[in-house]
Amino acid sequence: MPEAFERYSSNPTYEPPWRKVRFIGIAGPSGSGKTSVAQLIVKALNLPHVVILSLDSFYKSLNAEQKKRAFNNDYDFDSPEAIDWDLLFVKLLELKQGRKVDIPIYSFNEHNRLPETNTLFGASIIILEGIFALYDEKIRSLLDVSVFLDTDSDVCLSRRLNRDINYRGRDIVGVLEQYNKFVKPSYENFVRRQLSYTDLIVPRGRDNKLAIDMVINFIRRTLSIQSETHVKNIDSLQQIVPTIPHLPLNLVQLKITPEISAIRTILINKNTHPDDLQFFLSRIGTMLMNLAGDSLAYEKKTITLHNGNQWEGLQMAKELCGVSVLRSGGTLETALCRQFPTVCLGKILVQINKVTQEPTLHYHKLPRGIATMNVVLMASHLTTHADVLMATQILVDFGVPEENIIIVVYVCYSESIKALAYIFPKVTIVTAFLESVAEPVVGRLDIEKVYYGC
């Protein structure tokens, strides 16, 4: 790598929104409407990066004797001792660091944690709700806003009866016994004490629309500030690009042969039939995947020939995964699967806000164990680099080493390559056509529209 480029790329500055996650804690007595308030907030905002984290997920697993007591409604779930505070703190810290986190699933029917987990990643706002959300000092230290729902006890009891009977498989006698034995004493001894730690006390709980609107407006202001900061962060990368004199050495481009030049002419000709455009895009895609295959790591493998002799050949050193940046990356999936039939696939949906120009993560589905694989990240263009930049950051946050990522695109601008390589200097970029922002040719082609016909 040229010395000047190495110097610039040694200090990456990109900070995705989930690296500055904000926590909102909502506490209150059982049945006060914590879950309902959290759901109202999420529904009002209607954003994929505002999520709810229930304290119920962090109940401790019970041993045989404790389970027996629980099934007899004789186990105190309304005590702070029932919560695994250490695990909760570790998970919140990991979320604060922008990492992928596996959240446990607790079954109230089995009184145990299930082997499955829920994956949480990419959230900008996390609402932690539970009767003891503000109880633990370490947890409170991570919260940006704390809310306490102060609801009439009779209302709380009626809601608890409805929830436990209809959703947790309890009977009315057992619920009332547990309420009188554990819930009421817990409120006086533990839950109510959290009032002294709260920023906002909400009388009448979920029925207090004004207070809920205040919380929603706070979140909107926070997200607006995060959005402005994120866009400025991306813009700052563009300002650095002119100071980088060289393209990275890990840029791999198709050799410009007469065939490639002819295909380029066909692609940019406005009179080319759509069927021909699709055919030649597929042809270029196949060439790109051949080139990407040469960039993978291989290891020796000894096999037995049909005549019984031994032969030492090569095999891929790691399992291969293809990840499409939707929807443009889907145009390269067929070529990838044709070249590597056993490849596993993942999807990332990053959309650019038309008003703020901020990339936003809307969806991701990645194979388990992706951190140990070589990953081919596919997109049609690397022209406005924000979506591919965010997708690459997602892979890194899922534990994929930079050197195991190969970005494959039909066309890219030299400015976008420099910006991307400034942040991820070890990522390999494979492309067919290299252009500049000032003189785009193939870069003007709407590849997704041509490929999908819409």
UniProtKB/Swiss-Prot annotation:
Q: What is this protein called?
A: Uridine kinase
Q: Where does it mainly reside?
A: cytoplasm
Keyword annotations of the record? ATP-binding, Cytoplasm, Kinase, Nucleotide-binding, Nucleus, Transferase
Single Gene Ontology BP annotation: pyrimidine-containing compound salvage
The similarity comment for this entry is:
Belongs to the uridine kinase family.
Q: What class of enzyme is it?
A: transferase
Q: Which reaction does it catalyse?
A: uridine + ATP = UMP + ADP + H(+); cytidine + ATP = CMP + ADP + H(+)
This chain's source organism reads Schizosaccharomyces pombe (strain 972 / ATCC 24843)
Question: Which residues of the sequence carry a binding annotation for ATP?
Answer: G28, P29, S30, G31, S32, G33, K34, T35
**Gene name?**
urk1
- One MF term from GO for this chain? uridine kinase activity
